[in-house]
């Protein structure tokens, strides 16, 4: 069977079948991120049925989130080696199998492996290839296409949260997991929509491709143990790593990475413990599930409106500050949460936290681009999202241990709130220190020799200027006449 490749124009079509790709990615985000959020609705059911404490039960949600983030590069590798369609279909089968096997679990360890590892691995194989495919079909309207595709997370949470609660009441948690397993099989349909596209190459493309093939053949014919081949390969590998991941040595990026660890630690436990906390203060099951729905839909509003606002001319130069503001406000919401012990008070909390959660998630790529530049943005974002994996894994169990130890949610929520506030303060101090360092440079230049105003490379350039001053004027005149004659 021959593989059919579709050849388009030299640039992405920005429409056509691309809108089906957007629809497919929209459904993928519903079946992955929204379903992951709704697993927290099963928390009380798992805890009651297996008679386990908070920390042990929280590992289920942590493993799903961690596997989805940790194995995202594996999803890219599978889709590149096979195809995007095959990768997403395989991920859909694995995720559905994990949910179905989870419905027959007899212990939490079975849920760790089935609902945690297997389902999380399936989500990882689907999530990153679907997002990458949108970028292949869109160029000018890429941001708008991504806005529609990524909104599936919030919309899916808004719809699925009350539906999952209803399924649990009607069919128990086992029946609800079984039905979710069938629902997640729609990922295979989404994978079928991801039709590959091959863009026309430039006229010089075939020659370049031919040259690359010739070089590849020469490398194959060369002995792998040749010292020259080995030295060239090692040099090329070091240069490519330095160009692709040189930002890891930047102090600003190191500060961002540390702040992301604290931010990810703070934001994750709420999606696990909001429903159990609401139930513990006397809120009904339907109202607790509705709080998750509110959180999801307001998250979409934060994504769209905050991104639009920071694109305005008045705020465009203050995106970094807006990011810090959003993260800090989510931390303040955490600090206020232990005092909110009724449904009318928890609704404004869900709205506020959901809005600013969507706000700073939108600005993460923007802040990263300001630090590393657009050239290394793709690699830097991969590292930033990879750093979410460990906090997503450990923060819910730590919060659960605090609940078991103290008998209340106060300590867990306060720790999460202070973690997010510290993340914001850390980036803020780094920004202030960098600005103060810049303001000191003009004062140093004013106090130095006036010739430094003409040279930008410091002492080396000044020594060159000094040598030119010591040159004999006659030799310089002869040099000028010689240039004129030639």
Curated annotation (Swiss-Prot):
<dbReference type="GO" id="GO:0015881">
    <property type="term" value="P:creatine transmembrane transport"/>
</dbReference>
<dbReference type="GO" id="GO:0016323">
    <property type="term" value="C:basolateral plasma membrane"/>
</dbReference>
<feature type="compositionally biased region" description="Basic and acidic residues">
    <location>
        <begin position="201"/>
        <end position="220"/>
    </location>
</feature>
<feature type="transmembrane region" description="Helical">
    <location>
        <begin position="383"/>
        <end position="403"/>
    </location>
</feature>
<dbReference type="GO" id="GO:0022857">
    <property type="term" value="F:transmembrane transporter activity"/>
</dbReference>
<feature type="region of interest" description="Disordered">
    <location>
        <begin position="201"/>
        <end position="221"/>
    </location>
</feature>
<keyword id="KW-1133">Transmembrane helix</keyword>
<comment type="function">
    <text>Functions as a transporter for creatine and as well for its precursor guanidinoacetate. Transport of creatine and GAA is independent of resting membrane potential and extracellular Na(+), Cl(-), or pH. Contributes to the process of creatine biosynthesis and distribution.</text>
</comment>
<feature type="transmembrane region" description="Helical">
    <location>
        <begin position="10"/>
        <end position="30"/>
    </location>
</feature>
<keyword id="KW-0472">Membrane</keyword>
<keyword id="KW-1003">Cell membrane</keyword>
<feature type="transmembrane region" description="Helical">
    <location>
        <begin position="253"/>
        <end position="273"/>
    </location>
</feature>
<dbReference type="GO" id="GO:0005308">
    <property type="term" value="F:creatine transmembrane transporter activity"/>
</dbReference>
<dbReference type="GO" id="GO:0046449">
    <property type="term" value="P:creatinine metabolic process"/>
</dbReference>
<feature type="transmembrane region" description="Helical">
    <location>
        <begin position="410"/>
        <end position="430"/>
    </location>
</feature>
<feature type="transmembrane region" description="Helical">
    <location>
        <begin position="115"/>
        <end position="135"/>
    </location>
</feature>
<dbReference type="InterPro" id="IPR020846">
    <property type="entry name" value="MFS_dom"/>
</dbReference>
<dbReference type="GO" id="GO:0015292">
    <property type="term" value="F:uniporter activity"/>
</dbReference>
<protein>
    <recommendedName>
        <fullName>Monocarboxylate transporter 12</fullName>
    </recommendedName>
</protein>
<comment type="similarity">
    <text>Belongs to the major facilitator superfamily. Monocarboxylate porter (TC 2.A.1.13) family.</text>
</comment>
<dbReference type="InterPro" id="IPR050327">
    <property type="entry name" value="Proton-linked_MCT"/>
</dbReference>
<feature type="transmembrane region" description="Helical">
    <location>
        <begin position="353"/>
        <end position="373"/>
    </location>
</feature>
<keyword id="KW-0812">Transmembrane</keyword>
<feature type="transmembrane region" description="Helical">
    <location>
        <begin position="289"/>
        <end position="309"/>
    </location>
</feature>
<feature type="topological domain" description="Cytoplasmic">
    <location>
        <begin position="1"/>
        <end position="9"/>
    </location>
</feature>
<feature type="transmembrane region" description="Helical">
    <location>
        <begin position="320"/>
        <end position="340"/>
    </location>
</feature>
<feature type="transmembrane region" description="Helical">
    <location>
        <begin position="177"/>
        <end position="197"/>
    </location>
</feature>
<dbReference type="GO" id="GO:0005886">
    <property type="term" value="C:plasma membrane"/>
</dbReference>
<dbReference type="Pfam" id="PF07690">
    <property type="entry name" value="MFS_1"/>
</dbReference>
<dbReference type="InterPro" id="IPR036259">
    <property type="entry name" value="MFS_trans_sf"/>
</dbReference>
<feature type="topological domain" description="Cytoplasmic">
    <location>
        <begin position="431"/>
        <end position="486"/>
    </location>
</feature>
<dbReference type="InterPro" id="IPR011701">
    <property type="entry name" value="MFS"/>
</dbReference>
<feature type="transmembrane region" description="Helical">
    <location>
        <begin position="148"/>
        <end position="168"/>
    </location>
</feature>
<feature type="transmembrane region" description="Helical">
    <location>
        <begin position="86"/>
        <end position="106"/>
    </location>
</feature>
<feature type="transmembrane region" description="Helical">
    <location>
        <begin position="58"/>
        <end position="78"/>
    </location>
</feature>
<comment type="subunit">
    <text>Interacts with isoform 2 of BSG; this interaction is required for its localization to the plasma membrane.</text>
</comment>
